[in-house]
């Protein structure tokens, strides 16, 4: 919630409202629909193709390995996953690092999916706590040891113009406050180039690009905002974080999106039966168009390793 000009004081974090309707309009389309074109782990963010011959499932596991390896996880720690999706990162962390997990999601379908997955875990092999909540970061205030957020930050800003990004201030302060003195956080988000990089890349803004951006913000991710690296730097440092590493992996989103589009096309009849022809066409346009954006470097992905 952005304060009005007549009331410049910042809104207290717990009075900020999570974008529940906007998030559910996309992620609650139906689990069955997403299963048609995501990999078996249901990971819905840029994969990491360490080698070009990896399958999408292998590349998604490599991405989770990459992200989790930057956190310094130890057995018994508690990992907070903000925007946990369908839970693949939490399950990976439990399996590989023997940690407790808390997942936050605004999707009712993802909540139900994660509860089922947690119930399937062999409790004779681990007694770690596994908690998933229908809750935004705005209401979270419990101590944790590490934080990860993959492909959710794009939903955290609000409104148009620079004022909409001020929610980042509250987000990073919450993260800083719940972490211990040696706390670490991995933030994986789509980014856009600043003016200098845009010029260096020779990027232009044709009408076709503007139409596609409007399509994405209207039909796919209403309310979505993409940050620049400088904005992550600014708001995270305001909270007290230092960026230990910037790791740009946007080139890997091209094969990720291409794999998703190919899988959706291969399941065209099933997708139409589930959601109708219009939704099928909309998602094909979204996936193929976004692949072009990453190919041409209008968008990128950066993993920020943040330390206290």
From Swiss-Prot:
Keywords: Cytoplasm, Lipid biosynthesis, Lipid metabolism, Methyltransferase, S-adenosyl-L-methionine, Transferase
Gene Ontology cellular-component terms listed: cytoplasm
Source organism per UniProt: Mycobacterium leprae (strain TN)
Self-association state and partner proteins as the record states: Homodimer.
Pathway, per record: Lipid metabolism; mycolic acid biosynthesis
Lipid biosynthesis found in the keyword field: yes
Pfam families: CMAS
Function: Catalyzes the formation of trans cyclopropanated ketomycolate or methoxymycolate through the conversion of a double bond to a cyclopropane ring at the proximal position of an oxygenated mycolic acid via the transfer of a methylene group from S-adenosyl-L-methionine. In the absence of MmaA2, CmaA2 has a non-specific cis-cyclopropanating activity and is able to catalyze the conversion of a double bond to a cis cyclopropane ring at the distal position of an alpha mycolic acid.
Catalytically driven reaction(s): a 1-acyl-2-(9Z)-enoyl-sn-glycero-3-phospholipid + S-adenosyl-L-methionine = a 1-acyl-2-(9-cyclopronane)-acyl-sn-glycero-3-phospholipid + S-adenosyl-L-homocysteine + H(+)
Keyword Cell cycle carried by entry: no
Lineage, highest ranks first: Bacteria, Bacillati, Actinomycetota, Actinomycetes, Mycobacteriales
Compartments, as annotated in UniProt: Cytoplasm
Binding site for S-adenosyl-L-methionine: 44-45, 79-87, 105-110, 137-138
Enzyme class: transferase
Family membership noted in the UniProt record: Belongs to the CFA/CMAS family.
Example GO BP: lipid biosynthetic process
Name of the molecule in the record: Cyclopropane mycolic acid synthase 2
EC number of this enzyme: 2.1.1.79
UniProt-recorded Gene Ontology molecular function terms: cyclopropane-fatty-acyl-phospholipid synthase activity
Catalytic-site annotation from UniProt: 290
